[in-house]
Every structure is written in structure tokens, then in C-alpha cells.
Amino acid sequence: MKILAVNRELKQPINDFVGVDVIPDSAMIQDGKPFFVPDFFNQWCYYAVLAFRVSRLGKNIATKFAHRYYDAVALAVRTSPVVTMPISTAVTTAFDGAFICGAWTQIDKLNENPRISIGDKSISISTANLLINDSVAYLSKYFTLKIGDIIIPAKISIESEIITDTVVVGK
């Protein structure tokens, strides 16, 4: 299992110049296990993301068929250090605990514009802006998608000082 994260903001288009982080399954925390801030950097940033679970094997998937290749969505958090010098992407994105995954919800139970709340901050997300089908097509050009893989189509920016509780409303 691997986690493929497209490095783009919510409203940015997907093109051949967008970066992709490949995150190993060892970086994932799930099932309510605690997260501890690592001590190898002083400052950390957190990105809320919607993660999509791949449900079938595929390679070179056309955008019009991409919806057949994922079956569930979860709210997740990507953790990365704030760095001012060039450093290996693996160190900043693939360490143990870099990806915190919530409970999976069947994709058909999610409405068109889910709302994500973090503490007292909230944002509505247009699923059209996520470009999940475009992300599946783009990623499958370079990677074989396997059952259980996770795709993160975009970062979701919510200004908040401390993440205390996260909820997806609209399922």
C-alpha cells in the first residue's frame, strides 16, 4: 500500500509539472492511535486533506473511468516540518506519523459539497475543485494503482493555530 499525494492547492489545475509525494504505509497513523510531534524539527505545519481509497487495480486510467477506481473517503492530516534549507522530500513527508488518517466513509454517502471543521474554523469544499478523477488519471500514468492505495488530490488550507478536533459534515 502506498499513499500518493498530489502537491497542489485546492483550486490549482493538474498538469504535468505538479509534484507528487509517495508516502509509505509506515508513515500512516490510523484507528485512533496517538500522534506525537517528532523532535527532529522545531516547527511543524499541518494540512487537512481528503483521502480517497483505491478499490481496484489500474494503470493508465482515462479520466472518464476514474470514478470506478475509488470507493471511500476519509479526512486526514499531513504533517511536515517547516524548513528553510533544502532537504530530502522523504525526510519531510515520509517519516513515521507524517499522515494521520480518519475513519473511511463510502463515497456514495458524501454529498457534493462537504464541510470540514477544524476547531472553530470551517470550510465548504466543492468536490469539483478536488479533481479526484483527474488525479486518478494523472497518477495512473506513472504508478500502478493497487487496491488499498490512498490518493490525496489536493491540500485544503484552513487558517487555524491549533488542531483540536476535525470533522467532515455532509456524509
Show which residues each predicted segment covers.
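Catalytic-core "active-site belt" of small-molecule-metabolizing enzymes
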Residues: 1-150, 157-171
